[in-house]
Swiss-Prot record:
Translation regulator forming a complex with DENR to promote translation reinitiation. Translation reinitiation is the process where the small ribosomal subunit remains attached to the mRNA following termination of translation of a regulatory upstream ORF (uORF), and resume scanning on the same mRNA molecule to initiate translation of a downstream ORF, usually the main ORF (mORF). The MCTS1/DENR complex is pivotal to two linked mechanisms essential for translation reinitiation. It is linked to Immunodeficiency 118: An X-linked recessive disorder characterized by increased susceptibility to disseminated mycobacterial infections in infancy, notably after Bacillus Calmette-Guerin (BCG) vaccination. Initial clinical features include fever, lymphadenopathy, hepatosplenomegaly, abscesses, and osteomyelitis. Affected males usually recover with treatment, have no other infections, and show normal growth and development. Induction: By DNA damaging agents such as gamma irradiation, adriamycin or taxol in lymphoid cells, but not by stress stimuli such as heat shock. This induction of protein expression does not occur at the RNA level, and does not require new protein synthesis. It holds the Pfam family PUA. The PUA RNA-binding domain is critical for cap binding, but not sufficient for translation enhancer function. MCT1 N-terminal region is required to enhance translation possibly through interaction with other proteins. GO terms for cellular component: cytoplasm. Changing residue 118 to A: No phosphorylation by CDK1; No cell growth alteration. Keywords: Cell cycle, Cytoplasm, DNA damage, Growth regulation, Initiation factor, Phosphoprotein, Protein biosynthesis, Transcription, Transcription regulation, Tumor suppressor. GO terms for molecular function: ribosomal small subunit binding; RNA cap binding; translation initiation factor activity. This is Malignant T-cell-amplified sequence 1. The modification Phosphoserine is found at residue 118.
Length: 181
């Protein structure tokens, strides 16, 4: 999604949100990520201005004080940015890939089933369409945010094809954006 993303070319406008809209977004985030509720006022303080940065391909990035927190495409689900995920790693369930998959994931490739079932990888129970943080064997922080394309059970059974779709990874265009004022 952000492989060829460039802040100067892809951002179309930025709007400040009303309190009622912010409340709706917070409720949607709590519904989507139940573990985030105790931390939401710390992530999105009440007095700080919340803005939506609109980009090409119907992508919206939610920012607070210029810090990129969440993004979504069209009216779809919100995904946390990796910078937020590194501060609050418990927001998303984790899946772990083996060392051999790291370079492919960091180049934007989807996570294939064998990279999740080999030694060194850890596959935790998760349903289809669950948003997950992809961790790497021997690494502390998440290297990608993805969406389960198969359930964990099916990944173990089939062990072929795309298991997790790579949505946002380290060093992609969104990662390089850092802040937006």
């Amino acid at each position: 999604m952000f492989k060829k993303f460039d802040e100067k070319e892809n951002v179309s406008n930025c709007i400040q949100l009303k309190t009622s809209v912010i409340k709706g977004i917070k409720n949607q985030l709590i519904e989507q990520f139940p573990g985030i509720e105790p931390w939401l006022n710390q992530i999105m303080p009440k007095k700080d201005p919340v803005k939506i940065v609109r980009c090409h391909e119907h992508i919206e990035i939610l920012t607070v004080n210029g810090e990129l927190l969440f993004f979504r495409q069209r009216e779809g689900p919100f995904y946390p940015t990796l910078r937020l995920l590194h501060k609050y790693p418990f927001i998303l369930p984790h899946q772990q890939v083996d060392k051999g998959a790291i370079k492919f994931v960091l180049s934007g490739a989807n996570i294939m089933c064998p990279g999740l079932t080999s030694p060194g990888a850890k596959l935790y129970p998760a349903a289809v369409d669950t948003i997950v943080a992809i961790m790497a064997e021997g690494k502390q922080h998440a290297l990608c945010v993805g969406v389960m394309k198969m359930s964990a059970e099916d990944i173990e059974k089939v062990n072929k094809g795309i298991g997790i779709e790579n949505i946002h990874y380290l060093n992609d265009g969104l990662w390089h954006m850092k802040t937006y004022k």
